[in-house]
Amino acid sequence: MDSQRELAEELRLYQSTLLQDGLKDLLEEKKFIDCTLKAGDKSFPCHRLILSACSPYFREYFLSEIEEEKKKEVALDNVDPAILDLIIKYLYSASIDLNDGNVQDIFALSSRFQIPSVFTVCVSYLQKRLAPGNCLAILRLGLLLDCPRLAISAREFVSDRFVQICKEEDFMQLSPQELISVISNDSLNVEKEEVVFEAVMKWVRTDKENRAKNLSEVFDCIRFRLMAEKYFKDHVEKDDIIKSNPEVQKKIKVLKDAFAGKLPEPSKNAEKAGAGEVNGDVGDEDLLPGYLNDIPRHGMFVKDLILLVNDTAAVAYDPMENECYLTALAEQIPRNHSSLVTQQNQVYVVGGLYVDEENKDQPLQSYFFQLDNVTSEWVGLPPLPSARCLFGLGEVDDKIYVVAGKDLQTEASLDSVLCYDPVAAKWSEVKNLPIKVYGHNVISHNGMIYCLGGKTDDKKCTNRVFIYNPKKGDWKDLAPMKTPRSMFGVAIHKGKIVIAGGVTEDGLSASVEAFDLKTNKWEVMTEFPQERSSISLVSLAGALYAIGGFAMIQLESKEFAPTEVNDIWKYEDDKKEWAGMLKEIRYASGASCLATRLNLFKLSKL
């Protein structure tokens, strides 16, 4: 049976190719030509049969009662000859050269002449090219040409990145209906409805005279009951444009009653703009007005989670619910890496080693990735200028700092500091660290970068602590740690730098210290229950967690060996003690650990 299907498919492809090649030859040799399409000053000889087979528009035209002379020469108004030429060649060859400069014109013309094959190719092309800079234009095109597939794709792209895109100039040029199609969407990726309100009012003020009259209609798409009541009173009720609009003022009164717990009776004739029409049929069920809609946006399911990143996957752990969620596959992430989450909740991974055969001067490179929270994919960024390991990572004002470490080619200790600017998308060097060090740790807080401990050139642990001010470009000493150490955990917890475990001159350590940033003093905290190195500390939602690391474990041979452990502990501040939470979380194996905010709506529970 399979062989019969394969034969049938082979014959179909052969016949299709034969037919296509034959048609192309007939056009090029101008054989059996029975019509000419005219666009501007250009003429295009064609075959009625081919045009009719590929386009319902031309089929209806050639089968109509129009006199024969008009069928022989068809004048097409407002058609770019170059675009028409591309479409005709596609009909005869199944090949078309789409690019960013012509795709919208080809799309519009194929829509006008009802050529579904070209239309579909253009839709697929535009969907793949969606970007923050063009998504609103593509949304507008999809709505204009009544193409739900394209309009929905563009709208979902805008919704996922609403906080960024609502600041663009193109957003301010949306028509009222285009704006409504965006802000009525349940999928809007906003943590607070206040963001939607502020974007709408900025849109209104861009053309206040003309848009104030559309405010009532747009108003219905804002979900005011999701706002804090204080914000509603301070910013919505007191807005000068809202106060001067009688129609909107009636809705404000209803909303004030709703905040007081008095909802109106649902009505089948209730205004439904923003109540869900764009997301599906609303039917005849009783509805509240759209502005009373209290269904959370998809972006409102954001939660503080611990992100575990290893060379297999990035998994988010919720310590409150003891649940794990798949965030992204991570097969391209190197096992020995460092990771960082920025103040803007952007996750970066740096490290590992690969060979760039095209780079003859510096073939060894270190990976650099960023996690796209929308697509759950890792985006490759420019690699480190010099491959290194055992370095520290910091961040200030969205710039990433790679501090010291070991050169992967020479194994020499480093004091150099690299800075990545995401706007320029390139690396540069900044002020060197005062000493060469590796196996240290780096943490950022309040616009400063702190470098702690590590091993120096003589392979001895240091207790030195440095602070870097990016604005001044200098490193300064702070009070040293009580215990010199390397390969330890660090976190900012309740305004203090907390360090735990690590390697000392005497071996593995269980000691924990906290540095008071205000007093420049270290204090001893309760020891961790087990001596460990490479332990991860994470401060999440006011709680401090310790995850994994390496401990000396007795083997069956009775010998002790450094062994990876994958448990989770929580520091109970009131009792000043460590409490075990999970004996093993398998996703922690070989993982770096971060405190981040992720949208549960987009994640799959494991």
Curated annotation (Swiss-Prot):
Keywords: Cell projection, Cytoplasm, Cytoskeleton, Endoplasmic reticulum, Kelch repeat, Membrane, Phosphoprotein, Repeat, Sarcoplasmic reticulum, Ubl conjugation. PROSITE patterns: BTB. InterPro entries: BACK, BTB-kelch_protein, BTB/POZ_dom, Kelch-typ_b-propeller, Kelch_1, KLHL41_KL41B_BTB_POZ_dom, SKP1/BTB/POZ_sf. GO terms for cellular component: Cul3-RING ubiquitin ligase complex; cytoplasm; cytoskeleton; cytosol; endoplasmic reticulum membrane; M band; nucleoplasm; plasma membrane. The keyword GTP-binding does not apply. Kelch repeats lie at residues 346-398, 399-447, 448-495, 497-542, 544-599. SUPFAM superfamilies: Kelch motif, POZ domain. PANTHER family: KELCH PROTEIN, KELCH-LIKE PROTEIN 41. Coiled coil: none annotated. This is Kelch-like protein 41. Involved in skeletal muscle development and differentiation. Regulates proliferation and differentiation of myoblasts and plays a role in myofibril assembly by promoting lateral fusion of adjacent thin fibrils into mature, wide myofibrils. Required for pseudopod elongation in transformed cells. Interacts with NRAP. Part of a complex that contains CUL3, RBX1 and KLHL41. Interacts with LASP1. The keyword Cytoplasm applies. Residues 33-100 form the BTB domain. GO terms for biological process: myofibril assembly; protein ubiquitination; regulation of myoblast differentiation; regulation of myoblast proliferation; regulation of skeletal muscle cell differentiation; skeletal muscle cell differentiation. Residues 135-237 form the BACK domain. Skeletal muscle. Localized between laterally fusing myofibrils in skeletal muscle (at protein level). Expressed at a lower level in the heart compared to skeletal muscle. The lineage of its organism: Eukaryota, Metazoa, Chordata, Craniata, Vertebrata. The modification Phosphoserine is found at residue 3. It comes from the Eukaryota. It is found in: Cytoplasm; Cytoplasm, Cytoskeleton; Cell projection, Pseudopodium; Cell projection, Ruffle.
